[in-house]
């Protein structure tokens, strides 16, 4: 486990529990964040309210309209920026419907928006006849001012088959084929594309795209599953390169080489009932639990082992569970006593990896 030593591990009236480098504060983040030291955390990863009044929940309302909601989130993120070390990164969740509000709040708080990771999934019920079926969510990649800290690309490549893609030359110093490929010189033992050479068999460059199967998928995909649909539209793959659909680790098993579009992106299952409620006495009733595996992926993109993550909207604790599993420290804030208790119970299971 990681060392429990942490600048935030000091007794405060709002501290609910601290253990194994993980701290949960019960309270409003607007009140708790100002008590934290400046430039004391390494990354921000959080799932704030969306501002649409999801399922009639009070905490997800728009605070009185667009401007009021953006001003509220800007205030929270301004404190997050103060607490975050210069040049460090974060991911902030948003629904497509109000992701422009969230991005505006990020920029107004002083962050730079660098990219958006889109998570596409196969389930979701339309909430009215004037809306499309919800099938995607956004994770906005932001950066604090200061020298840019690189993403951890090499540790998070997407697995491929054992076959070198046909478009890559196997002979160092040469270029496969002709035409436009002459603009892509090959490096010794890898491919060089202006960003340094790498071994093509080490996996694909992480994409800003994640996929989840439909709830109705079994051994074969259900109709309308985004994973199956992307593969279908990108063309057939050879039998020996078919992906292992239900693999627990995308970097193991068999993967596509250059065909089969879904294989080019990060696959993560939506959280099952057992995942959400493991070790929770009365079940996990939180309506927007995120997949632990997706949170691990995002954490590993922007932090090193042992570093400290801030989540000011902890919910039922998925970010903390993911941090625990990949040997990171975390400080989380949650306004609901019920969700704090669920998070405590989920974390009591300890690391699974």
Residue ranges and their predicted role:
Residues 2-353:
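Core catalytic lobe of class I
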């Amino acid at each position: 486990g990681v060392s429990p030593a942490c600048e935030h591990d000091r007794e405060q009236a709002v501290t609910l529990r601290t253990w194994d480098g993980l701290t949960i504060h019960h309270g409003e983040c607007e009140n708790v964040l100002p008590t934290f030291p400046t430039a004391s955390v390494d990354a921000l990863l959080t799932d704030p309210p969306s501002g649409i009044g999801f399922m009639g929940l009070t905490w997800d309302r728009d605070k009185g309209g667009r401007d009021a909601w953006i001003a509220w989130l800007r205030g929270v993120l301004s404190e997050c920026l103060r607490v975050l070390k210069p040049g460090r990164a974060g991911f902030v969740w948003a629904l497509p419907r109000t992701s422009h509000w969230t991005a505006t709040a990020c920029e107004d708080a002083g962050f730079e928006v660098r990219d958006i990771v889109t998570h596409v999934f196969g389930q979701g019920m339309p909430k009215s006849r004037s809306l499309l079926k919800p099938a995607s969510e956004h994770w906005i990649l932001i950066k604090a001012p200061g020298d840019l800290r690189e993403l951890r690309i090499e540790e998070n490549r997407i697995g491929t088959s054992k076959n070198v893609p046909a478009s890559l030359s196997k002979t160092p110093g040469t270029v496969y084929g002709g035409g436009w490929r002459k603009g892509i010189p090959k490096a010794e033992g890898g491919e060089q594309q202006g960003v340094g050479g790498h071994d093509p068999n080490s996996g694909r460059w992480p994409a800003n795209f994640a996929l989840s199967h439909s709830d109705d998928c079994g051994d074969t995909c259900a109709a309308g599953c985004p994973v199956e649909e992307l593969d279908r539209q990108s063309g057939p793959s050879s039998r020996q390169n078919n992906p292992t659909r239900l693999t627990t680790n995308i970097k193991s098993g068999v993967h596509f080489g250059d065909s089969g579009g879904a294989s080019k992106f990060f696959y993560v299952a939506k959280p099952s009932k057992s995942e959400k409620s493991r070790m929770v006495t009365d079940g996990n009733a939180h309506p927007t639990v995120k997949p632990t595996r997706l949170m691990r992926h995002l954490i590993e993109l922007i932090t090193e082992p042992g570093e400290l993550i801030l989540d000011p909207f902890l919910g039922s604790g998925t970010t903390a569970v993911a941090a625990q599993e990949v040997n990171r420290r975390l400080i989380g804030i949650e306004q609901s006593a019920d969700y704090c208790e669920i998070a405590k119970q989920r974390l009591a299971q300890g690391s699974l990896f």
